[in-house]
Regions:
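Sec-dependent N-terminal signal peptides of Gram-positive bacterial secreted proteins and lipoproteins
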Residues: 3-23
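A residue-level marker of the well-folded mature domains of exported/periplasmic proteins
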Residues: 20, 28-349
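Residue-level detector of alpha-helical hydrophobic segments embedded in or interacting with membranes
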Residues: 2-3, 117
Length: 349
């Protein structure tokens, strides 16, 4: 019954694209200048997302990564965003029914829906960002790959800077959902911040982590950040998409009220320096490179059953530009040294 409803959704999407050029609930685009001019097969990728692609955070970064990869490989691309959890499967299957070659699901929360659809559509590739390392083995048709940035290193990148910059010794972390990948980021953030703080003669603590149980509830992020600020948090990191945007609103408001910027935020997973006055740096994940690996495998006919890793060592992870107006030069130098230690495998050793 659910598959039948998804097929009806696919028909509705097709009619929408014909009538409105793909600009209603979806965003259909040509992937490159030569995508339909060489007489060869045009490959198609579709992304589904429970947050908005205009959220200035996770949703936007993941969408932009797909666009970058599609344009590099001359694929066409489409997205359906801001969907509810009960629409994950139907949205995926709708694209399967329309003949898309690859489904890109940017989050561990889509795992069950991806595995169900992958079983029903053995000829379609499913790329699951932040999918568990053992998820591909659970796909009975071998048509699922996990794209897995190193969660501990993501936390390290943010945590080292937080440890350098905190004055209160108290840090805030806001999560979207209590996912294993989020827990890994929290652990890395906390251990790096405490280690760097200790090197600087400071005692650093992570205040109790709060979860919004959503990636789109910006007001909840604002509420959480306001509470954490009242508890003394002066450096924030998060893993909650639009919820993070709400948190930054609260941080900016607190800084404005104080008359100076003394509470900071570290963005992710794209370089968003300048988006808010409070942002001092960003943890950057090159999701596009991992998506391109998957696209190449689809074209070569050997997609699936693997995990594509993103690390500091292979360039999949990095730190973005630093706000040198807020981060003193000596701390920039120390931060870069810590990043080099992470790449050398000597950090915290």
């Amino acid at each position: 019954m659910k598959k039948f409803l998804a097929l009806l959704l696919a028909l509705a999407m097709t009619l929408s694209l014909v009538a409105c050029g793909g600009n209603t609930n979806t965003d259909a685009n040509q992937g490159g200048d030569d995508a339909n001019t060489d007489g060869e097969k045009t490959y198609k990728v579709a992304m589904i997302c429970d947050s908005s692609i205009n959220d200035g955070g996770w949703g936007a970064a993941c969408y932009n990564a797909m666009v970058k990869a599609a344009e590099a490989k001359n694929w066409t691309y489409e997205v359906t965003d801001s969907i509810s959890q009960d629409a994950y499967y139907d949205s995926i299957v709708a694209y399967c029914a329309l003949g898309y070659d690859m489904i890109y699901a940017p989050g561990n929360q889509y795992t069950d829906a991806v595995l169900q659809a992958a079983e029903e559509y053995p000829d379609i590739a499913f790329a699951l960002l932040n999918g568990a390392e053992d998820t591909p083995a659970k796909a009975v048709n071998g048509n699922v790959s996990s794209l897995l940035p190193n969660a501990q290193q993501i936390g390290w990148i943010a945590g080292a800077l937080a440890g350098l910059m905190t004055e209160s010794g108290k840090l805030g972390f806001i999560g979207g959902m209590e996912l294993d990948t989020t827990k890994g980021k929290i652990a890395g953030f906390e251990e790096a911040a405490k280690y760097v703080g200790e090197q600087e003669g400071k005692t650093v603590e992570l205040l109790p982590v709060v979860y919004a149980n959503s990636f789109s509830d910006a007001p909840k992020g604002k509420e959480f950040a306001t509470t954490l600020i009242s508890q003394g948090a002066d450096v924030f990191f998060g893993d909650a998409s639009a919820v993070d945007s709400g948190a930054r609103e609260a941080i900016d408001a607190a800084n404005t009220a104080a008359g100076s910027i003394k509470i900071y935020d570290i963005g992710q997973p794209a370089d968003i320096l300048g988006q808010n006055p409070c942002i001092i740096c960003s943890q950057v994940t090159d999701n596009a490179a991992m998506i391109e690996v998957c696209m190449d495998a689809v074209v070569a006919g050997n997609f699936g059953g693997t995990t594509v890793f993103g690390t500091l060592e292979n360039g999949g992870l990095s730190a973005g530009a630093i706000n040198t107006e807020l981060v003193p030069a000596e701390k920039v130098e120390k931060y870069n040294a810590y990043l080099q230690q992470m790449m050398d495998g000597t950090f915290m050793k």
